Amino acid sequence: AYYSPSQDKIHLPSPGSFTSEYAFNATALHELSHATGHPSRLDRDMGGFFGSSQYAYEELVAEMCSCFMGVNLDQTASPDHINNHKAYVQSWIKAIRDKPETLIRAIKDAQSAAAFMDWKAGLITDKEYSQTMNSTMEIATRSRDRDAR
């Protein structure tokens, strides 16, 4: 499964290709998270190549967003799936150790992506979406201000 920014298209195998419905949904949410970064949506920097720090950052955002959104699914993640999420996020831990503020920024971007998907799905109102986006922007600003000191 992958998201193509140039085509603005998600390529997702059929549900039968996955080990479970949860695995399919988690993967779909991960790829949808990437799609929120498109310039016509939240406009995240998605220009990184595989192995670059920008690529790692975007993967961290998408995986965290997938986990945030997965809470809303009426499904229980198996221990294997939880370990898969954990391993995926741990694979990007070096970037976080090198620049701890990266984690704060990634959480903010993951929350923004989750709010965007909730808003587009009609799960939250325009007002709730605006409030969420404003609060995540305030957190990002405070984090940047602290880092500048």
Briefly describe each language-model feature range.
Residues 67-140:
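Long, well-structured alpha-helical subdomains associated
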Residues 13-16, 45-51, 92-96:
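Glycine- and acidic
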Residues 27, 60-67:
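Residues on a specific face of well-ordered alpha-helices
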Residues 137-149:
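Non-Sec secretion/translocation targeting segments of pathogen effectors
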Residues 1-23, 27, 38-42:
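Active-site scaffold of zinc-dependent metalloenzymes
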Residues 22, 36-63, 79-89:
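Post-HEXXH active-site segment of zinc metalloproteases
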